[in-house]
Amino acid sequence: MRKELLKKVKRVVVKIGSGVLTGENGGVDPGFLDGLAAQVAELSGQGTEVVIVSSGAVAAGRQALGLPDRPRTLPQKQAAAAVGQSRLMRAYEEAFSSYDLKVAQILLTRDDLANRRRFQNARGTLDTLLACGIIPVINENDTVVVDELKFGDNDNLSALVTNLVEAQLLLIMTDIDGLYTADPRTDPNATLIHQVGAVTRELERGAGGSGTSVGTGGMATKLAAAKKVVKSGVAAIIFAGRGERTLSRVMKGELLGTLFLPAGESLNRRKHWIAFTIKPAGSIVVDAGARDVLARHGRSLLPSGIAQVEGRFDRGACVRVLDPDGVEFARGITDYSSQEVEKIRGHQSSEIERILGFRYGDDVIHRDNLVLL
């Protein structure tokens, strides 16, 4: 199954974590980048387009600034990223030019992808670069981003980029062999899971833990990234990036790492964007009946099923949809503001115009703008 799935891949996103990219001195490892460039050149020669999501700017800046530990505050991280990003790209250029490959730097914030027009513009730019045979190297724009606009980590960014460029595969290179039944660093009985058909709550609980001294993402963030892409019908593989030509071997179907199979019913690109790219501005709590109608029958959310409104949001904002226990089970684009929803909640759609003095439609969230999680 793995080999057959990988044969169909024509565009792949490769996420490279700081723990893989950096050497013992904490800076970018030129030997690793040379090996990576050789493997990317091999894939490109076979007709596979490669997009790289690379960490490492903060780590490179930390080395240049002589900082003993990873920066903790946002200003420190931004200063380190400002110093390190140019060094990171220079290292990529030097390594890839040896194989006649050109690279392009793309720096993104969450706001770039949350805005649909900018999302589409970014897609057009990346498509053009790939058509020209150029390897995009994408990173979060750490020098200007604020906490509320952060992707959180590059694992999450790689999942969003996979949707952005419509890749058929996400590869996450990390410092361990893949997803284990337990933490292999503390449990000698932990075994590698070679294939995952569905990301369950049990798997998510077992993947806890934070990042390393040079990176922000632990296995939990990688599992979350895999969960995002499989929902749009894309496979993901988490594997050790420091082994011998592991990228090439994975792409040839060798049994390395953990393969996450695509979901049977996949989200279209727009619904994936709603579910995972836009940051929710608030929440709507629905009653048990409304939850059942939405979850089982794929209907629109009507005001009659709304029990509570949390937060302030405008018409057209993304909101979480919570069940009576406060558990999020859906997200959607609302046709009414929080103040308007507060006034019409619990009422029939036929009463909207009488209550508000106007009416955008019968639905608070139309089913075309609603995504079950």
Swiss-Prot record:
Name of the protein described by the UniProt record: Glutamate 5-kinase
| Domain (PUA) ranges | 281-359
InterPro entries recorded: AceGlu_kinase-like_sf, Asp/Glu/Uridylate_kinase, G5K_ProB, Glu/AcGlu_kinase, Glu_5kinase, Glu_5kinase/COase_Synthase, Glutamate_5-kinase_CS, PUA
What is this enzyme's EC?
2.7.2.11
Catalytic activity, as annotated: L-glutamate + ATP = L-glutamyl 5-phosphate + ADP
Higher taxonomy: Bacteria, Pseudomonadati, Thermodesulfobacteriota, Desulfuromonadia, Geobacterales
List the Gene Ontology MF annotations in alphabetical order: ATP binding; glutamate 5-kinase activity; RNA binding
Q: Which UniProt keywords apply?
A: Amino-acid biosynthesis, ATP-binding, Cytoplasm, Kinase, Nucleotide-binding, Proline biosynthesis, Transferase
Instruction: Give the top-level enzyme category.
Output: transferase
Q: Which gene encodes it?
A: proB
Q: What is its main location?
A: cytoplasm
PANTHER family under this entry?
A: GLUTAMATE 5-KINASE, ISOPENTENYL PHOSPHATE KINASE
Q: Where is substrate bound in this sequence?
A: 55, 142, 154
